Structures are given as structure tokens and as C-alpha cells.
Amino acid sequence: MNYCKTFLLLLMVATGLPMRAQIHKMERRDSTILTYNLNPVVVTGSGHHQRLKNTATPVRVLSAQEMREQGITTFDGALTRMMPQVSMAPNSMGSQLRLNGLGNKYILILINGLKLSGDISNNVDLNRINMARVKRIEVLDGAASSLYGSDAIAGVINIITDQPTRSLCSAGSTTTISGHGVLTEAATLDISKNGFGSYTSFTHDRADSYRNNDLEYKKDSDTETQPSIAPLFTGYRSNIFAQKFTYSPTQHLALNAGLDYSYKITDRPGTRADVTGGTDYEMRYKGLRWNVGTIYKFDARNSLQIDYSIDRFRYGKEYDVASGGFPVGTYIQSKKQRTIERQLKAILGIIPQGTTIVGNDWQLDKLVATSGNINQETYILAYYAQHEQRLDVGSATLLATLGARYDYHKTFGNHFTPKVSLMYSLGHLNLRATYSAGFRAPGLDELYYHYFSVNRGKPQISFGNLSLKPEKSNYFALNAEYRHDALAVSVTGYMNRISDMVVKQNIDVDNPTRQLLMNEFPEMTQEQADKMVSYARYQNSDKGDVKGFQFNLSANILRGFNLSANFAYTYARTKTGEEWTVLERSIRHAATIAANYHHSWGRYTININLNGRLQSKTYYTGSYEDAPGYGIWNLNTTHSFDVAKWGCLEPSLGIDNVFDRIDRRIDSSTRKYALYSPGRMLAVGLKMKFSYL
């Protein structure tokens, strides 16, 4: 056996590939636990593991236990039900995620610290996230580029996965069924023995398309209507297969290798002659992500970690019917992306009561986009350092953090981002102040886009811009927090100022310009060119200003009764030229509330959870209407039966949208929505878990 371990270790080292692993002990969830852990271990805020109370930068933690109790099965459901500063707008091109008013391209999404790539119109495909393995979700508000680099302007969302080690072999299955064809099925198989671990999972999700009003206004009319089958919510079918291996030959060394494959295809109404809104094709998405890594712990305070990952993603059209000369089953690729990432990080306890982090990141991005005529790649090379020092000041403690990052981008060159934070702690009270800078490197589509198409007889032209500068932000925050075993209360005020925002600007077309455009796109006819009044080009133009405050409360009020309440006020604006306007899709007021009760009688435990989300209107610009606010409440009950030492059954029964709130307005070309619920729905689930010690 020792020979096999040595051979496996030498084989992994000989490949020359860095590998990733996490050394940790799983906390078993006992069905008799009656309180929430209000001081969990987190990693995202500081880059190393520490208790939430001890972090100089506030982090919001969404635990798997809370998600299970609320009956949450999707990633977007977890964020919107539990975090008021987050909103989603689903469509056929992916969910439009927003954090504190800022869109998906300003939010860095990580899985165990590694970037999740693959976007659809700047929206990361959230269906690639394997909820069957989520242990917790850590959300860091505000700029965090000093540690995490590009894209971390609005914040960082880090999904931490679970690799249980308590049982030799365990298997589980979770099924949830609800209205409008909603089905979630997840199966897991885990093996852990003598430092070796194997973790296998498969997840299938599906939902049907629907709309809440069968009518729409005819174009340019606010009185005449016609039937439509264009979905408000786009149905889909998706599968995720994941395999992860871990190996710890000693208590100091851990190795890890993992692979995730994802597949998704939309399920929309087909084209019909008697009604508008159907389509001839579905959108198909595929992703393949694998990573290897290693971590070596010299002692409790000093470690070295190396990670390497490759993430491939592609999407395009798959025709349901013969159309436009394409037979049934034809696949036309729209976009193919590949991201290669390598991280090297050392966590050092050189100075007493201090933690130093130094690291080097390298990332290569490649994009092939048929619609934009792009086949390009770029890279970023970065070095960063951060020192965190704790000082005792009488009975109080002062924690100071200073960090900086240097990035070199192939196109725009050098960039520097600093961070400074202070935390004053006295007993259970924490006072925090943070300044951090953020930046976002222009995407390959924004740099190299070269697009021409004709839509309903009108030509459309868009260009990228190699002279683009990175978008930059300055984030300031003040936080006061009281955290105890039974109560956690915090108030945060912040300001995030963004400059050099990359936007598409329309440029007027005159006769000389029209001729230049015809030379650039020879396929454009003179008749089409004569119809052009403008073309689009990516430019650094707008400024953004986001201010707000957040209130968070979590309490273990009585034995078995827990309450959480969160409120976010967001005042978000953008400036084009000399005019300030409201930031599109921002929400001024939002709140989430959850009350949870659980009790055990012998081998049976009941859990009752009531949760709600309330928000004011969603702002839109131009000719679009603002989307009205809403309030939705959900009720979920779970019933746990510990049938034996080797098995547990947990049926669940819930009602989504208890009060049947629906936006039934007649659709139009200027109408926007915030509430996408089809109304009250019954949700039924069953979780089974079996283990062999």
C-alpha cells in the first residue's frame, strides 16, 4: 500500500502540472442541531481561512443548511432569496445577474477560488454551477481586485464545494418536483479511505417555458393586441456530471484533480403561422472544466498552494425545424471560449499575529466568435501581496490589512490596484473601514468585435476598439457589527465609483463613412448602406456611482427558532457626457426575511421555513418602462427520518409564491419585468442518503 501511495505521488509530480486540494474536516450536519452557526469559517474576504468575526472585510455566507431549509435548488434562487442586493432577469441568453446595481461583467464568480468562465452576452452561464456539491456560498461586496484581479468591481461570489470524509462510502439522491415542469434530480457517490477520496455527482434540471399573459400589444400600438407564445421564462434541460479525486499521503500534503461537464439546451415554443413568438431553433450550451492542484502545509501558519485549470465553453443554435436552408438538427456555433488559469499562492506566518500572502497569477483567454468575426487571445500576468497584522490595544484588538496587485495585460499594459482595511474589535463589537480598488480588463469581444448583419432589412454594424482602457473603480465602506453565538447584527455603508466604463456608442453615418463601411464589409449592398444612419463602437465613456447601505440580522431567538432579516438600499447612477441617469436594472429598496423552526422527536425532525423577498421597482432607461416592485413569500417544510445508522430519508413539501403574486400585464416592446413567477406552485421533494462506515 505504501508503495502504491509513493508511486501515485511521483506520477502526479512527474506530470509537471500543479494540482489543487483543500485540507479540511467536514462538519457533519446532525438532524438535531437547533441553532445556526453565526461565526463560520470563511476564505474569500482575506484569502485565507479564518472565522467570519475575525475578517477585516465583511463577507456574507449562504450555507447549504439554510438553502436546504428554504427549499432552494438553484444558484440564482439562493442569491435572490437570501440576498436583497442581488437581482436576476432570466432570458434565453442566460440569467442577467446584478449585485448592488452592477451587472454580471463586474462580478467575479469563483468555484473554490478558481474563475468560472464562459459567458453569454457578458452573463456567466449560472447553470454550470453544480448545486449538489455546494457547501456554502461566500459573497464579498465591493471591489476586490487587489486579491482577485480583473472583473472584481461589484464583488466576488465564491462557491465552496464539499468533499465529505466521515464515511468510507456514501450515496445520496435529491429530487424536487414543482409546477411548469420544474424537476431537479441530483445523485452523489462518495468514497473516502486512507487519505484517498473520490466524489462523483450527476445533476439534471429542467423547466418548461411559460408566459403569464397570452396577449401582446401590436408594434407601435398601445390599444391593439395579438396573441403571442414568446416565453416570459425560457424553458431548458440541463445536465452536469462532476468527478473529483483527492489524495493526502501525509497530514502536510494534499492533491486534487477534478472535472465538470455541463450541457444545456433551451426548450422554447416552435414557430407557428397563426401566432407570433415562436422560434425555429434552440440555444445549446456545453462546458468542460477541469483543474488539478496541490497544497503543502509546512505548519499551521505556513502553506504553499498551486492551481491549474482549463475551462472550455461554447454555445450556438440547434435547429428544431428546417429553416433558412438548415435541416433539422443542424448546429451553428456562435461562440467558443477557452480560459487557462494558473495560480501560485503562499500563506506565511512570518510575523507574530500577522499573516502575509504573496502570489502570482497567469490567465490566458481565447475567443472564437462567428457572429463577431473574432479569433483572438490575450493574457494577464499578475503579482500580488497582502499583509494582515493584529495588534492588541488594551482589551481591544486592531486588525490592519494592506494589499496591492500588479497586472500586465497583453493589450492595455500595466495596472496597479491597492487595498487598505482596518478593524477595531472590542468584545463582540467590530468596527471596520475599507478602501479597495477594482478593475476590469476589456473583453476580447470589446477589443476585436467586427460585426455585420441585416435584421428585418436594416443593417447593423459594430466594432471593437483596441485602444480601450481598463474600467476602474474606487470602493469605500464603513461597517459596524455585533456578533455573538445567539445574535449577529451588522450595518454597512458604502460608495463605489467606476470610471472608463466600456459601452457601445452609436456614431452617425455620413456619405464618406458609409463608403468606408462598404469597403470594410463588401457583402453589404448599396441599398443596405443607404439605410444606415449609425454604427456602434465600443468606447470608454460612462462613469458609474453606486451608494448605499445594508442591514443584516441573524438570531437564534429560542431553542429551535431562528430568524434572519436583510435590507439593502442602493442608489445607482451612470453618467454619459454631462448627464447623470439612473443605472439600468438597479433597485432602490429590497429586503429578504426568513423564519425557521425545527424540532426533533427521537429519530424524526421537522423543519418549517417561511421566507420572503420584497423589493421596490426596477429602473430602466430610454423608452422602456420601469418594472413594478413586488413581494413574494415561500413556505417549505422538511421531515427528516434517521431510519438507521446507515441511512436517512428527508421528504419535503412546500408552496412557492404563497399569495399567488403574478405580473399579468400585456406584453409590449417597451415593457420590462422584475417578477417572473408563474404564480403559486406546490413543491415536493425527497432526499435519501446512505452511508457505510
Where are these regions (language model features)?
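Conserved C-terminal beta-signal and adjacent last beta-strands/turns
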Residues: 7, 247-248, 433-436, 562-564, ...
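Extracytoplasmic beta-strand/coil segments of soluble accessory domains associated
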Residues: 76-114, 135
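Short acidic/polar hinge/loop motifs at secondary-structure boundaries
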Residues: 114-141
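Outer-membrane beta-barrel translocator/receptor signature
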Residues: 118-120, 133-135, 146-158, 163-214, ...
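Periplasmic-side early beta-strands and strand-to-turn transitions of outer-membrane beta-barrels
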Residues: 166-167, 191-283
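Outer membrane beta-barrel strand-and-loop segments of large Gram-negative receptors
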Residues: 335, 339-346, 382-384, 469, ...
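Surface-exposed extracellular loop regions of Gram-negative outer-membrane beta-barrel proteins
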Residues: 373-374, 410-415, 424, 428-476, ...
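Gram-negative outer-membrane beta-barrel transporters
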Residues: 391-395, 495-497, 522-618, 689-692
